[in-house]
């Protein structure tokens, strides 16, 4: 009986996570007997409350690739510090491969102004007001990783105040 309850708790924890597939691509590998086909899935996992991760999964079928992508995304979760207006604390940039992403905080009511994979990452991270721009590449995997890289570099108000040696109240005066 105790095992069953524990399993239910684990399922409840899993239901708080949302996952969105960014891309499914059929890929092939040349082997001695010809071409071996498989699928690659790029998946973003987040709880819309400050945690997000990007995962990649490969398998012989689409469902298996998505499942592996979700597992990989949960291994690569990051914490995102958000303001009371559900925006980011300061301007930030991120890069991965040839992709670059610039993110700027926005006023309440602005919404998520971003495109493609970056928009998906921001929505699943719980960001509600932000301006973002993709530069350099239209590759969904590199853009998603660049967005995560940009969110990783964010610092909270308390971290900035501590580095400057002032209190949070005196940070902007």
Swiss-Prot record:
GO terms for cellular component: small ribosomal subunit. Residues 17-80 form the S5 DRBM domain. PROSITE patterns: RIBOSOMAL_S5, S5_DSRBD. GO terms for molecular function: rRNA binding; structural constituent of ribosome. InterPro entries: Ribosomal_Su5_D2-typ_SF, Ribosomal_uS5, Ribosomal_uS5_bac-type, Ribosomal_uS5_C, Ribosomal_uS5_N, Ribosomal_uS5_N_CS, Ribsml_uS5_D2-typ_fold_subgr. Belongs to the universal ribosomal protein uS5 family. The N-terminal domain interacts with the head of the 30S subunit; the C-terminal domain interacts with the body and contacts protein S4. The interaction surface between S4 and S5 is involved in control of translational fidelity. This is Small ribosomal subunit protein uS5. It comes from Microcystis aeruginosa (strain NIES-843 / IAM M-2473). The gene is rpsE.
